[in-house]
């Protein structure tokens, strides 16, 4: 059994992710982090799901059982945990959240002492300890060696100051009418405070979490409700966050949802114009539209592509000394300000871009038009290595000659292959996706 997925441990609360699993996972993580412990403190935060109380209690029990002292800070965004772990000199940070998933799911994410997500090797080491009964039993403490926990409620101020410092001091949000959809999630207190203190006229939606309404018809996965309010209130811009606020979706003044690649492209050129781009390079994933490549090329900015997942975006950024990157889905990383995707930092940078250019959002983001794409999720019998499929290379070469970009990858959780074709000629792309489907049906189902 494998515990860790692409972003920590995640599952239905009370089933796959129950109290026993959470406690044992915390014990395993505590044992792992104790090897290089400096302060013997671990920070624990959560989003607004009801199951967070159960999981938080189990995690505290597991960590204190192996001798760790725990600092509980309550509902806070995931990027706040990354920042505060380093800022408060903790050995590690733990975030209890299932991000954009429904309320009955939950998850556990880990950060090292520098606020970075754990490497695959570190996750594997924790997983090995989790399944090793003898190691777990031998590392439980007794007497005064048992850890203790305390709750601190005022750390929100540290994070708010940090976020506000990412906004240019030469600008003010005064006169900007902003609508925020905080998704009944972890950012429900922080986001309105930040925008109001910077001078914006701030209207807030979905800021009454009750444990079961996080992401429920609201937030980054449902920007249509935000769009209606932006139009009704004649706002300048709207921002929607997901449950743990590491993702951002933007709505312009005409109630149109801004394409994620347009967001990346415009922000990259804004940073470059203001000498905030360390290199004339950014990182996106293989899912980003080729229109982004072409737009950046006109501005002499190179696009590097990573695998899907903000963890892989960040890895490539670090490897290449790049300070900006992100995903089409709205995970955007400004590494000068945050160690992970931070929806609030992104929202402030978008606002700064609007003010600096003195233009409407629709004018700025409408300059990048995505090329037509066709996506297909094909059910298959077996997942054979793609490089072993006879005729696939020839098919890809033929499509490339026709100006069509291809991306074929298996689902990580089900017997499905995801097919993507992209090109400037929509009719041709539509015709060719049918041919590609036939190829894979024959190759993987016969």
UniProtKB/Swiss-Prot annotation:
The modification Phosphoserine is found at residue 99. Activated by phosphorylation. Binds 1 Mg(2+) ion per subunit. One of its GO terms (biological process) is peptidoglycan biosynthetic process. Its cofactor is Mg(2+). The keyword Isomerase applies. GO terms for molecular function: magnesium ion binding; phosphoglucosamine mutase activity; phosphomannomutase activity. Catalyzes the conversion of glucosamine-6-phosphate to glucosamine-1-phosphate. This is Phosphoglucosamine mutase. It comes from Campylobacter fetus subsp. fetus (strain 82-40). The gene is glmM.
